[in-house]
Amino acid sequence: MATINQLVRKPRKRMVDKSDVPALQNCPQRRGVCTRVYTTTPKKPNSALRKVCRVRLTNGFEVSSYIGGEGHNLQEHSVVLIRGGRVKDLPGVRYHTVRGSLDTSGVKDRKQGRSKYGAKRPK
């Protein structure tokens, strides 16, 4: 326990909280261009081919972003919108692509949870 005199001489340090999504620079989303679209395998207990793209953002950052949903139309030079949100079983993937905006199509034949995948309401 510090004495009052010690605290007068040297006040307590404030804790600085580190951002989980530094490339967004306090913005809700960021636009970027795909530099590489590929699949990768998840960490130990899980097994799949997860769809991921490498994106060069408008602020100069280059990040890996997960493409959610079944099937996608992304290729190199596609313009995408990136939001925060990591993928727990893919190390280094801390962003998600927003489906149904810019060059990213929505998920086809999606009936439930449509807003998360940019799918229109079925007639």
UniProtKB/Swiss-Prot annotation:
Keywords: Methylation, Ribonucleoprotein, Ribosomal protein, RNA-binding, rRNA-binding, tRNA-binding. One of its GO terms (cellular component) is ribosome. The keyword Cell inner membrane does not apply. The keyword tRNA-binding applies. It holds the Pfam family Ribosom_S12_S23. The modification 3-methylthioaspartic acid is found at D89. Residues 113-123 have a biased composition (Basic residues). Gene3D superfamilies: Nucleic acid-binding proteins. Residues 100-123 are annotated as: Disordered. GO terms for molecular function: rRNA binding; structural constituent of ribosome; tRNA binding. InterPro entries: NA-bd_OB-fold (IPR012340), Ribosomal_uS12 (IPR006032), Ribosomal_uS12_bac (IPR005679). GO terms for biological process: translation. Part of the 30S ribosomal subunit. Contacts proteins S8 and S17. May interact with IF1 in the 30S initiation complex. Belongs to the universal ribosomal protein uS12 family. NCBIfam families: rpsL_bact. With S4 and S5 plays an important role in translational accuracy. Interacts with and stabilizes bases of the 16S rRNA that are involved in tRNA selection in the A site and with the mRNA backbone. Located at the interface of the 30S and 50S subunits, it traverses the body of the 30S subunit contacting proteins on the other side and probably holding the rRNA structure together. The combined cluster of proteins S8, S12 and S17 appears to hold together the shoulder and platform of the 30S subunit. This is Small ribosomal subunit protein uS12. It comes from Pseudomonas aeruginosa (strain ATCC 15692 / DSM 22644 / CIP 104116 / JCM 14847 / LMG 12228 / 1C / PRS 101 / PAO1). The gene is rpsL.
